[in-house]
Amino acid sequence: MTIMRKKHPLIKIINHSFIDLPTPSNISSWWNFGSLLGLCLIIQILTGLFLAMHYTSDTATAFSSVAHICRDVNYGWLIRYMHANGASMFFICLFLHVGRGIYYGSYNMIETWNMGIILLFAVMATAFMGYVLPWGQMSFWGATVITNLLSAIPYIGTTLVEWIWGGFSVDKATLTRFFAFHFILPFIITALVLVHLLFLHETGSNNPTGLNSDADKIPFHPYYTIKDFLGVLFLLTAFMILTLFFPDILGDPDNYTPANPLNTPPHIKPEWYFLFAYAILRSIPNKLGGVLALILSILILAIMPLLHTSKQRTLTFRPITQTMYWILVADLFILTWIGGQPVEYPFTIIGQTASIAYFTIIVILMPIAGMIENNILDLN
């Protein structure tokens, strides 16, 4: 078996990736989220496949087909709620994974990091299109509002929006193409994940100290397979509690009303995992400015390697930057809360302050803190 594992053309790829992979001996549970994201992706693809067997992407029957899945299909309610809440678990793991990358300076592995940003955009696009498919009120109006943002692009904006809609409003053509894209994107994401792993295994994993760990590597299996499995148990426990006891807690009640183009909901808002970006979008009174801020709120991750001023890689031994980091985390919670609130005083001013703080901490305060720490430790 050992010979086959190391010699067989296919199995040896798996062997070098998950079995004999040299791994730092000191990586913590924050390194579990990569494998958990893989699990989330598998859950989403499998539940999505079974949902697609019963779903119809037609404006007249989409809402009814989802109701039919929940009422008449064997365990359809479970598959539907696993898929809906699986998206939430996916984003929780994603945010923690990215947060770990920022804290421990993993962005210095530039190819892996940039691939991760592309993956983040792809997952966000997939989740957005998936939210449109049940064709409830928030599905319809969310699709209308978010796609309409593209009209802010000078000269070609309006034409581009109508091209995406396939008409003069969000309608049957839009729903059909969103279903097609929502189906294909997870497979593209799977391919991108393999590239992400390929880049990661070129350099090897980072570790909490940020120091070179070549002198102290251990095989991935059994040490980290068992550690990942513990993470899987925790994730599945939380996931099934959420799905079986509180399936609708993260959803919007408006989405249980069929889409009606003649009736606008009082507060149009996306799913919780987009609220931080939505708050940044709304905090700028200008449409084009808001769209640019929205894109930059994620794209800013790409310039993190350029903003790294410290002589140390991680924040483990850097208390000043640590403080900035946790203020940034708190700021993201505030933005998430504001994104779900109506556009009125005092929420608007809180949102604007939090948006300015978000960009200021990343672009100005954290690099300055890095330089101060270099001086304190006399690393210059």
UniProtKB/Swiss-Prot annotation:
Output a single Gene Ontology CC term carried by this record.
mitochondrial inner membrane
Report residues binding a ubiquinone: 201
**Keywords, ordered alphabetically:** Electron transport, Heme, Iron, Membrane, Metal-binding, Mitochondrion, Mitochondrion inner membrane, Respiratory chain, Transmembrane, Transmembrane helix, Transport, Ubiquinone
Lyase is among the record's keywords: no
Molecular function terms from GO: metal ion binding; ubiquinol-cytochrome-c reductase activity
Q: How is the cofactor bound?
A: Binds 2 heme b groups non-covalently.
Q: Which GO terms describe its biological process?
A: mitochondrial electron transport, ubiquinol to cytochrome c
Q: What is its main location?
A: mitochondrion
- Establish whether keyword Transport is in the entry: yes
> According to its UniProt record, which cofactors does this protein need?
heme b
Ligand binding (heme b b566): 97, 196
Pfam families hit by this protein: Cytochrom_B_C (PF00032), Cytochrome_B (PF00033)
Where heme b b562 binds, per the record, is at 83, 182
Q: Where are the transmembrane segments?
A: 33-53, 77-98, 113-133, 178-198, 226-246, 288-308, 320-340, 347-367
List other remarks.
Heme 1 (or BL or b562) is low-potential and absorbs at about 562 nm, and heme 2 (or BH or b566) is high-potential and absorbs at about 566 nm.
The subunit structure is:
The cytochrome bc1 complex contains 11 subunits: 3 respiratory subunits (MT-CYB, CYC1 and UQCRFS1), 2 core proteins (UQCRC1 and UQCRC2) and 6 low-molecular weight proteins (UQCRH/QCR6, UQCRB/QCR7, UQCRQ/QCR8, UQCR10/QCR9, UQCR11/QCR10 and a cleavage product of UQCRFS1). This cytochrome bc1 complex then forms a dimer.
Q: What is this protein called?
A: Cytochrome b
State the organism named in the record.
Microtus oaxacensis
- Name of the gene this protein is made from: MT-CYB
